[in-house]
Design a protein with these regions (language model features):
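Histidine-acidic metal/acid-base catalytic patches
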Residues: 2-43, 48, 52-63, 188-204, ...
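Conserved beta-strand positions in the central sheet of alpha/beta enzyme cores
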Residues: 71, 96, 138, 230-233, ...
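Active-site beta-loop-alpha junctions enriched in small/polar residues
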Residues: 47-49, 73-75, 99-102, 142-144, ...
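A structural motif
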Residues: 67, 129, 134, 229, ...
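Glycine-rich, proline-tolerant flexible connector loops at the mouths of alpha/beta enzymes
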Residues: 72-88, 141-148
Length: 306
């Protein structure tokens, strides 16, 4: 089913209050958002909160420090009841989850049993994020290695993602593929084509701003991927540290101190009228003071929107 057919079908079943796998698809996800000023709420990964606190108190701390949401790994290590209770007590949102099995059991693996494990895990994540009141699951699309060729990963992962579409349609949740250091989909033009070939409104990109600085410029990716970007991850990166100390050392730089040209990056976010609603920090965590600093830095970055 292509985008046009899916949207027509969703409109019909919503009006008819039909039951079945399509009935719960989220109409708001599929509707084209009106033009207007881009607005982003702040979120951070739960693992970044290093204070020795209960789940509820970690959520409360995040809220006190100016964060509107928390991103969880999924399937979660907590029960749904625990998560919802802590969410309500803190008055915080849980808009996105990161599937935790896509590296160990990648969607590009040549073994069908391995792919099945990941598909089942992502299906659980789609239901989980819906139950939590969110709308998006982050998924790594695949991994290229010495034993898995680029072309093989491309075709295999696309087919696996297509197998996930019925679960996305049933829940109305989005599958957002993240650009990571997986030796795969290394240009924005290719990343755009990958999504367009899948051709479904509930499959797009979870764009990581810092991950591309190793070999590109995030503003280029943002303009090319455009409306295919569902959510944004926030990272900083230093090419100087990369060149002098090693690839992974490039991430060891504070927000606003690396090579992201934040006014230019956020101008691109504004230009595409990004309506994903969230900017989620994925940087080194720490105590209350460190997290407050991150929150303040994010405020400055968001201020460059227009």
């Amino acid at each position: 089913m292509n985008r046009k057919e899916f949207i027509k079908t969703a409109a019909f079943i919503t009006g008819a209050a039909a039951t079945g796998s399509y009935a719960s698809a989220s109409a708001t996800v599929m509707q084209k958002k009106p033009l207007g000023r881009v607005a982003l709420k702040k979120s951070l990964g739960l693992g970044m909160i290093k204070e020795e606190l209960s789940l509820a108190d970690k959520f409360k701390l995040a809220r006190e420090l100016g964060f509107d949401g928390v991103e969880l790994n999924s399937p979660a290590d907590f029960t749904l009841t625990e998560l919802l209770k802590a969410k309500q007590a803190a008055g915080i949102e849980l808009p996105t989850v990161v599937n935790k099995d896509h590296w160990s059991s990648p969607l590009s693996d040549p073994d069908p049993a391995v792919r099945k494990k990941c598909i089942e895990s992502v299906a659980k994540s789609l239901q989980e994020v819906k139950d939590l009141g969110g709308d998006t699951v982050l998924v790594v699309p695949g991994v290229v290695s010495e034993k898995v060729s680029y072309e093989q990963a491309y075709l295999t992962s696309q087919n696996a993602i297509r197998e996930l579409i019925p679960y996305a349609e049933k829940t109305g949740m989005q599958i957002a593929l993240e650009n990571v250091w997986n030796n795969f989909l290394l240009s924005p033009v290719e990343a755009k084509r990958f999504i367009d070939e899948i051709n479904h409104p509930l499959v797009g990109w979870y764009f990581d701003i810092g991950n591309v600085l190793r070999y590109g410029w995030p503003e280029h990716w943002i303009r090319t991927l455009n409306s295919r970007i569902m959510k944004l991850h926030l990272k900083e990166y230093s090419r100087e540290l990369m060149n002098t100390k090693g690839l992974w050392e490039g991430f060891k730089v504070d927000l606003l101190k690396g090579d992201n040209n934040w006014p230019v990056v956020m101008k691109a976010v504004s230009e595409i009228n990004h309506q994903g609603g969230w900017l989620t920090a994925e940087v080194s965590g720490g105590d209350r003071n460190h997290l407050k600093q991150i929150s303040t830095q994010m405020d400055e970055i968001i201020s460059y929107l227009y």
